[in-house]
């Protein structure tokens, strides 16, 4: 997804990111690097697991949570002793990082709690004149956030699901990994991005129903709708009105 970037070594620039997003200051940012060779400058301890995952998935949608170096500002990490690090795989982002030469703190480029943008137009529509420059790299290929893996514990733990699956992580590490399933209270900060009780919330009404109730619910929803209506179903449905946007899983439901 598109990111809202700032010099990770400049506290004033980092504070501006929090201000523009409306993001709590105790909600840490991910630092983006141009290559895995820069890990030692940001992490106090780069474990063998970190090296394995970096070699396998960087550049790519994987963030490694490691103990932060003493030179990393608490403004970036939300006051926590850990830092999230990633090497993105988009050519424009990589060229920017190489030209800049340092780390760029970059959460998704949207107001805090809203859906992450996948085009430059989404960024402009949400953030407008609050950002100095919008670098248009075209539509995003993935469209979801990076997977975050905590490597500061004895057993690696996925803190946020994303572009790299648990199966692929376990295949590279050769062991099972944990999955964090409980959201932390919003008043207590978060160990990593995407871990608050409410996150990535679209500004839309959502109705859950059983398959046999779909027709009845659609009649009710369409009667009060003031905009587009989408339907996410486990299998294809027939006889839907033309103004319904229908989505269905690309694979077996168990995969989700």
Protein language model features and the residues they cover:
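Active-site-adjacent structural elements in enzyme catalytic cores
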Residues: 1-256
């Amino acid at each position: 997804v598109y990111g809202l970037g700032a010099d990770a070594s400049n506290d004033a620039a980092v504070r501006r990111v929090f201000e523009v997003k409306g993001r709590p200051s105790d909600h840490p940012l991910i630092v983006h690097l141009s290559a895995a060779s820069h890990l030692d400058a940001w992490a106090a301890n780069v474990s063998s697991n970190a090296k394995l995952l970096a070699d396998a998935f960087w550049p790519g949608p994987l963030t490694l949570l490691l103990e932060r170096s003493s030179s990393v500002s608490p403004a970036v990490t939300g006051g926590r002793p850990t830092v999230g690090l990633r090497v993105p795989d988009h050519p424009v982002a990589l060229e920017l990082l190489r030209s800049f030469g340092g780390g760029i703190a970059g959460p998704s480029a949207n107001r805090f709690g809203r859906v992450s943008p996948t085009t430059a137009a989404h960024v402009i529509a949400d953030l407008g004149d609050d950002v100095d420059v919008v670098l248009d790299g075209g539509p995003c290929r993935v469209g979801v956030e990076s997977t975050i893996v905590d490597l500061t514990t004895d057993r690696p733990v996925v803190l946020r699901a994303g572009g790299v699956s648990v199966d692929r992580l376990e295949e590279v590490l050769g062991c099972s990994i944990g999955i964090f399933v409980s959201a932390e209270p919003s008043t207590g900060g978060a160990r990593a991005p995407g871990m608050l009780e409410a996150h990535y919330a679209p500004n839309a009404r959502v109705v859950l129903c059983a398959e046999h109730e779909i027709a009845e619910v659609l009649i009710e929803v369409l009667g009060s709708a003031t905009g587009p209506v989408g339907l996410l179903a486990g299998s294809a449905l027939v006889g839907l009105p033309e103004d319904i946007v229908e989505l269905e899983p690309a694979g077996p439901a168990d995969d989700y």
